[in-house]
UniProtKB/Swiss-Prot annotation:
GO cellular component, one term: cytoplasm
EC number(s) from the headed UniProt entry: 2.7.4.25
Gene from which the chain derives: cmk
Family: Belongs to the cytidylate kinase family. Type 1 subfamily.
Listed name of the protein: Cytidylate kinase
Length: 221
């Protein structure tokens, strides 16, 4: 069983997916973390982390590194680098690198392999999860929220290291890039359950989703 969660950046996908995983006893996967790890690989290869590298160069670098999955976490060469990928430098570049078709193919293949060789149930969140990676998922969700709300959430997550105005600009730019991607663009898929989380807490959102999920299972019996 796969529950797929889609939506724009900072709409609550990761927090909600993690909590749903705990409540439903499903394993959690974030495709966004995988793209961020690849962005970290690119930045580590450069003298100036604000520069960019070509798609071919990045594809070669990925082959030189080991990305594995263990206990709902992607590891880079056996190391948990989550504290190194959730920052403004990664935010600034991850949309650019995730627009490379070759990179998206690698990420999608990795996600499918994790699920294919496992008997576990999964909650997988990320942009294009419901449209490209797992369009056949048994339950598809699209989480949304206003830019102002998303910026405030990220501001709190980052302990105020960036201003709200900076975060709003970053998110607007990210939305624009994600919606115009040639491959894997951000959009609503057929049969998706749409939920605006702007003024809902984590507990309320999870309760709504679980109620909808249970109702769907009853109807399909």
């Amino acid at each position: 069983m796969i529950i797929a969660i889609d939506g724009p950046s900072a709409s609550g996908k990761s927090s909600i997916a993690r909590e749903l995983g705990v409540r439903l006893n499903y394993k959690f996967i974030s495709s966004g973390h995988l793209y961020r790890i690849i962005t970290l690989i690119a930045q580590r290869s450069l003298m100036n982390s604000c520069d960019f590298i070509s798609e071919d160069s990045l594809l070669n670098l990925i082959l030189e590194n080991d990305i594995s999955f263990n206990n709902s976490t992607f590891l880079l060469n056996g190391e948990n680098v989550e504290n190194q990928i959730l920052n403004d430098k990664i935010d600034f570049q991850v949309s650019f690198y995730s627009s490379y078709v070759g990179i998206r193919n690698i990420v999608n293949k990795k996600l499918r392999e994790v699920v294919k060789f496992s008997d576990d149930n999964y909650i997988i969140e990320g942009r294009d999860i419901t449209t490209v990676v797992f369009p056949e998922s048994e339950f598809k969700i699209y989480l949304d929220a206003s830019v102002k709300v998303r910026a405030l959430r990220r501001y709190k997550q980052r302990n105020g290291n960036e201003t709200l105005e900076e975060l709003e600009r970053t998110l607007k730019r990210r939305d624009d890039v994600d919606k115009k991607k040639q491959y894997g663009k951000l959009k609503l898929s057929k049969g998706v359950f749409y939920l605006d989380t702007s003024y809902k807490g984590l507990d309320d959102v999870c309760n709504i989703i679980i109620e909808k999920f249970n109702l769907k299972k009853v109807r399909e019996r």
